[in-house]
């Protein structure tokens, strides 16, 4: 027979629950309630939908910030509305209450354990430790002191319509725009009619936005509607663009004009450090227009699964804004028929800073590899190098490994299984592959002690995935 140990609730917990049940008692007591009781009682009130208690607690909140996002993951729109009603009561007051410290309603999806820290403190009585463990959160300096309340939010526009929480919030903000500042640092557009996107962007201070991801199947005419908003995001640090297509109804002249309108917006983005472009078809033959408008030194540059001309690569190697790159990802760009001299020049230019290099699936063949080896061997800060999906032979692979031997910071290396590993029909010959891995293991360990080297196969025709193997026999790495 199993015996369970029942832990009775602490006196503070019982007092808090009693307070939530008695509205009249709550009104008279909150002004004198110890600060450490507010977070656990607020969680209790929110989960139990004690709306009147929530309104009162918001008005007496003893911290300058209310991080509400972790709590609204619970399906409780009624409790969320009660919090907004409590804020309304505060904003409508002519004179601030003695205890009013609340300045920030934080709806960002941040990794912060505010509620967990305080609930654990409640359980163990370690309130002093809870105060010490709170992490400072960056404010919005551009609006400091202008409005009594700042609302931080991350906008994920992924459905045809907004979720009920965001709809409720934006309607509330729209009706009180003179009393508060809506600050959005991260904007992610994954699918929504642009007329809806436009109405939301008009409510947000675009100068606050630091990260933007657009992952929609937009054609150029839709991109032109977004372009003016991009130019106003003057503090943008990270931009991700995916699946931008050229409509077949757009003439070459129209395409050039649209690309010019879009790329000239980069002249205004003087804080941009990270640029990611995946499956962006309008770059072909126009990369120089974008690069010439960059006014900052990029730290991250990713151009993947795009079609580029050889002239585009030449312009990339000559761009002054890429000389301090830490990450360069050109995976999925077909280079088979191109000279790799521009890539060699590019690697020479970033050798002092480059830490991550991805050249997967570029179709680089044996005769092209030698062009980049001297520059690659001078990338002394490199810690990750990926070269999967390039059809090279055993001799070329050995030559490549011998040139990376002096890269002491290299921790992860990914290479393709050499062509000798495959049969005439293109399928992997397992016995031959095992023999090649054993030969490579002996060769590499004669040269150096690698931290991690993986060899990958071609994509499986059945599952569409690759398999990765390290140098040890029969060891598969997912």
Curated annotation (Swiss-Prot):
A molecular-function term among this protein's GO annotations: ubiquitin-like ligase-substrate adaptor activity
Source species, domain of life: Eukaryota
Biological processes per GO annotation: negative regulation of apoptotic process; negative regulation of cell differentiation; negative regulation of DNA-templated transcription; positive regulation of cell population proliferation; proteasome-mediated ubiquitin-dependent protein catabolic process
Keywords: Leucine-rich repeat, Repeat
Per-repeat ranges for LRR: 99-126, 181-205, 206-232, 233-268, 269-294, 295-326, 327-347, 351-378, 379-403
Residues making up the signal peptide according to the UniProt record: none
GO CC list: Cul2-RING ubiquitin ligase complex; cytoplasm
Similarity comment: family membership: Belongs to the PRAME family.
Protein name: PRAME family member 4
Taxonomic source organism: Homo sapiens
Source lineage: Eukaryota, Metazoa, Chordata, Craniata, Vertebrata
Name of the gene this protein is made from: PRAMEF4
């Amino acid at each position: 027979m199993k015996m369970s140990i029942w832990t009775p609730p602490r006196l503070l917990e019982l007092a808090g629950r009693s307070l939530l049940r008695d509205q009249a008692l709550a009104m008279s007591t909150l002004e004198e309630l110890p600060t450490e009781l507010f977070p656990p009682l607020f969680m209790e009130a929110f989960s139990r939908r004690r709306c009147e208690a929530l309104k009162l607690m918001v008005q007496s909140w003893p911290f300058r910030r209310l991080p509400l996002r972790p709590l609204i993951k619970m399906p409780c729109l009624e409790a969320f509305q009660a919090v907004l009603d409590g804020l309304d009561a505060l904003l409508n007051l002519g004179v601030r209450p003695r205890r009013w410290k609340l300045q920030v309603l934080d709806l960002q999806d941040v990794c912060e354990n505010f509620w967990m820290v305080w609930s654990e403190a409640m359980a163990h009585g370690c309130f002093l430790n809870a105060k010490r463990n709170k992490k400072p959160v960056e404010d919005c300096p551009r609006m400091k002191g202008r409005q009594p309340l700042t609302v931080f939010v991350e906008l994920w526009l992924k459905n045809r319509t907004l979720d009920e929480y965001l709809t409720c919030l934006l309607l509330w903000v729209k009706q009180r725009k003179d009393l508060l500042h809506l600050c959005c640092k991260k904007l992610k557009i994954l699918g929504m009619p642009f007329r809806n996107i436009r109405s939301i962007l008009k409510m947000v201070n675009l100068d606050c936005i630091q990260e933007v991801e657009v992952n929609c199947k937009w054609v150029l005419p839709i991109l032109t509607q977004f372009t003016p908003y991009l130019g106003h995001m003057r503090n943008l640090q990270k931009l991700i663009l995916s699946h931008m297509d050229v409509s077949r109804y757009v003439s070459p002249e129209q395409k050039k004009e649209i690309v010019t309108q879009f790329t000239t917006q980069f002249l205004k983005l003087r804080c941009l450090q990270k640029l990611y472009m995946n499956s962006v078809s309008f770059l072909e033959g126009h990369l120089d227009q974008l690069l010439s408008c960059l006014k900052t030194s990029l730290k991250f540059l990713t151009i993947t699964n795009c079609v580029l001309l050889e002239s585009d690569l030449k312009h990339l190697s000559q761009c002054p804004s890429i000389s301090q790159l830490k990450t360069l990802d050109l995976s999925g760009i077909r280079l088979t028929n191109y000279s790799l001299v521009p890539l060699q020049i590019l690697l020479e230019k970033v050798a002092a800073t480059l830490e991550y290099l991805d050249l997967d699936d570029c179709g680089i063949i044996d005769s092209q590899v030698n062009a980049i080896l001297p520059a690659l061997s001078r990338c002394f800060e490199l810690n990750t190098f990926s070269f999967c999906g390039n059809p090279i032979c055993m001799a070329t692979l050995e030559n490549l490994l011998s040139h990376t031997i002096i890269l002491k910071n290299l921790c992860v290396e990914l290479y393709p299984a050499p062509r000798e590993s495959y049969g005439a029909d293109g399928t992997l010959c397992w016995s031959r592959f095992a023999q090649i891995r054993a030969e490579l293991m002996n060769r590499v360990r004669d040269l150096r002690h690698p931290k991690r080297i993986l060899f990958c196969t071609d994509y499986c025709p059945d599952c569409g995935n690759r398999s990765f193997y390290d140098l040890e026999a029969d060891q598969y790495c997912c």
